[in-house]
């Protein structure tokens, strides 16, 4: 590489930093909740980049809070233990034996792995779960299914599958106030002391709402909300999301994701974005470029 080539590369790097400056100012001191999972967690290079990106957010004055999933890791452990899984509407039926495995994997193996990614990048992350500091009080999640023989709705027992009933963010504030990055496993505790497995998207949205976060970033394995031609829709109001649901444009697995985003916005989050976690540096591209790379849902 010639001296002129090096100068050109340096100039391009300086230009990129300069372009990011308005966004760095916009988010200075902001709280950003990031739901981390899917392909972004499973591929080593993306995982390492994620850790560096979260560390960078902290370095430039943003307060990131990470909530992670761990479905593939749970599946692998259950397979090793020869425990069969049953799913209802995408939710894992979780009995007493299985919830112990779920907690071990989510609050143990995966939680410490994610915190480790960030720590190796030079920041200080602390792994916790919803049971710690009374962060998430859960209640049993109920589902019903219509009897095919008639019009009767039958209750389904999902076992120890829960949903947030109350979120107490004092432990989050304590950690961020000490300069630490909270990494939260989606396990909560009921009023009866029982442990509940909770969907990570739901936990991320509930924590973002309780914090009044500036942004919720949902890292997924899709580009965002797509129109009928498969083109990314970069920006949607809640009313526009509801219209796209009604006409079938938003369907399938995207429905619970947009529902989480809508609920977070209604609780006070300024914007919730569905972002393609398969894209390297997805968090930085979403926050520090004009228009971002995902679908922003707002009031």
UniProtKB/Swiss-Prot annotation:
GO BP: arginine biosynthetic process via ornithine; L-arginine biosynthetic process
Catalytic activity: N-acetyl-L-glutamate + ATP = N-acetyl-L-glutamyl 5-phosphate + ADP
Keywords: Amino-acid biosynthesis, Arginine biosynthesis, ATP-binding, Cytoplasm, Kinase, Nucleotide-binding, Transferase
One of the record's GO molecular function terms: ATP binding
Site description Transition state stabilizer, residues in chain: 35, 257
Binding site for substrate: 70-71, 92, 197
Pfam families: AA_kinase (PF00696)
Function: Catalyzes the ATP-dependent phosphorylation of N-acetyl-L-glutamate.
Protein name, as recorded: Acetylglutamate kinase
């Amino acid at each position: 590489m010639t001296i002129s080539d090096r100068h050109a590369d340096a100039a391009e790097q300086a230009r990129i930093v300069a372009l990011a400056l308005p966004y760095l100012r916009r988010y200075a001191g902001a709280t950003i909740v990031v739901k981390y999972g899917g392909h972004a967690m499973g591929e080593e290079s993306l995982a390492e980049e994620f850790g560096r990106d979260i560390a960078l957010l902290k370095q430039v004055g943003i307060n990131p809070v990470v909530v992670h999933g761990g479905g593939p890791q749970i599946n692998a452990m259950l397979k090793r233990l020869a425990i069969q899984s049953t799913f209802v509407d995408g939710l894992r039926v979780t009995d007493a034996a299985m919830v112990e495995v779920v907690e071990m994997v989510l609050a143990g193996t995966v939680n410490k792995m994610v915190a480790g990614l960030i720590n190796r990048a030079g920041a200080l992350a602390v792994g916790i779960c919803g049971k710690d500091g009374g962060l998430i009080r859960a209640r049993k999640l109920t589902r019903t299914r219509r009897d095919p023989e008639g019009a009767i709705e039958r209750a389904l027992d999902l076992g120890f599958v829960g949903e947030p009933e109350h979120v107490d963010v004092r432990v989050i504030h304590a950690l961020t106030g000490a300069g630490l990055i909270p990494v939260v496993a989606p396990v909560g505790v009921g009023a009866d002391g029982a442990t509940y497995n909770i969907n990570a998207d739901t936990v991320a949205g509930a924590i973002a709402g309780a914090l009044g976060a500036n942004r919720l970033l949902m890292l997924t394995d899709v580009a965002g909300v797509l129109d009928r031609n498969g083109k990314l829709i970069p920006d949607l109001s809640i009313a526009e999301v509801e219209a796209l649901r009604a006409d079938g444009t938003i369907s399938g697995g995207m429905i619970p994701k947009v529902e989480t985003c809508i609920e977070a916005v209604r609780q006070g989050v300024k914007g919730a974005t569905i972002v393609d976690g398969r894209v390297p540096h997805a968090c930085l591209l979403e926050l520090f470029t004009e228009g971002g790379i995902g679908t922003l849902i707002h009031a």
